[in-house]
């Protein structure tokens, strides 16, 4: 019992350390937000269910209209209208619901045609004035779009050169080539060293070469891996 109490006290002391105070603050805020979200969702569902306009799917399936019966409004129609409806239902191969479904798209098509005609009158852009501010806005929008496109290209190129953490430090994703070199090995580096250090270029290059050889020796012996860097992309 004493060992168990000591272990619980150790865990409590670890979690109540002042270093983790900010973490627990964020944790409690997130839990409070989650509870308020669940409460709001439950209230919304209850308000929809208790609404007088809410009809479950089972009620709609059992309604007289779904079964092919007549609604109270249709009962108040004249006998001639009801007789016409009966004659339409008595025709073979042309039931009533299918006729209603064919009439409704035609009516919607007429409404859409009338709305499109109205929009053609309202959305007349022949007399639209393009100001300097509008031109500047279009130019800035195009510039931002071009910058975003270039940024996407750079991200894609950087992603191709990305090396996973399970590879070593000398992982070459481009692969080896059997073609002869286009220039002498070390010629470009030697010219760069001479441009940077002048007369002392040979001595400094020898020191860098010795340091690089020592680094390669330790890498071959230890075989280190890359430290995993996980980017956060929201």
Swiss-Prot record:
GO terms for biological process: spliceosomal snRNP assembly. The SMN complex catalyzes the assembly of small nuclear ribonucleoproteins (snRNPs), the building blocks of the spliceosome, and thereby plays an important role in the splicing of cellular pre-mRNAs. Most spliceosomal snRNPs contain a common set of Sm proteins SNRPB, SNRPD1, SNRPD2, SNRPD3, SNRPE, SNRPF and SNRPG that assemble in a heptameric protein ring on the Sm site of the small nuclear RNA to form the core snRNP (Sm core). Its main location: nucleus. Pfam families: GEMIN8. Part of the core SMN complex that contains SMN1, GEMIN2/SIP1, DDX20/GEMIN3, GEMIN4, GEMIN5, GEMIN6, GEMIN7, GEMIN8 and STRAP/UNRIP. Part of the SMN-Sm complex that contains SMN1, GEMIN2/SIP1, DDX20/GEMIN3, GEMIN4, GEMIN5, GEMIN6, GEMIN7, GEMIN8, STRAP/UNRIP and the Sm proteins SNRPB, SNRPD1, SNRPD2, SNRPD3, SNRPE, SNRPF and SNRPG. Interacts with GEMIN6; the interaction is direct. Interacts with GEMIN7; the interaction is direct. Interacts with SMN1; the interaction is direct. Interacts with GEMIN4; the interaction is direct. GO terms for cellular component: cytosol; Gemini of Cajal bodies; SMN complex; SMN-Sm protein complex. It comes from Bos taurus. PANTHER family: GEM-ASSOCIATED PROTEIN 8 (PTHR16238:SF7). InterPro entries: GEMIN8. It is found in: Nucleus, Gem; Cytoplasm. This is Gem-associated protein 8. Residues 67-83 have a biased composition (Low complexity). Residues 60-116 are annotated as: Disordered. Keywords: Coiled coil, Cytoplasm, mRNA processing, mRNA splicing, Nucleus. Residues 100-110 have a biased composition (Basic and acidic residues). It comes from the Eukaryota. Residues 130-153 form a coiled coil.
């Amino acid at each position: 019992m004493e060992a168990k109490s000591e272990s619980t006290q150790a865990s409590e002391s670890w979690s109540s350390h002042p270093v983790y105070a900010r973490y627990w603050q964020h944790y409690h805020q997130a839990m409070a937000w989650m509870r308020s979200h669940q409460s709001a969702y439950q209230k919304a569902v209850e308000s929809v269910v208790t609404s007088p306009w809410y009809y479950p799917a089972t009620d709609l399936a059992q309604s007289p209209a779904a079964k092919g019966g007549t609604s109270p409004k249709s009962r108040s129609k004249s006998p001639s209208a009801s007789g016409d409806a009966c004659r339409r239902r008595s025709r073979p191969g042309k039931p009533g619901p299918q006729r209603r479904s064919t009439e409704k798209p035609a009516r919607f098509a007429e409404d859409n045609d009338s709305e499109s005609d109205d929009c053609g009158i309202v959305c007349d852009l022949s007399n639209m004035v393009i100001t300097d501010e509008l031109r500047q806005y279009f130019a800035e929008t195009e510039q931002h779009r071009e910058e975003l496109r270039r940024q996407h290209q750079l991200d894609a190129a950087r992603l191709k050169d990305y090396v996973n953490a399970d590879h070593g430090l000398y992982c070459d994703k481009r692969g080896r080539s059997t073609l002869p070199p286009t220039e002498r090995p070390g010629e470009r580096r030697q010219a760069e060293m001479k441009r940077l250090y002048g007369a002392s270029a040979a001595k400094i290059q020898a020191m860098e070469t010795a340091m690089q050889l020592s680094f390669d020796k330790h890498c071959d012996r230890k075989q280190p891996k890359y430290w995993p860097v996980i980017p956060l992309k929201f």
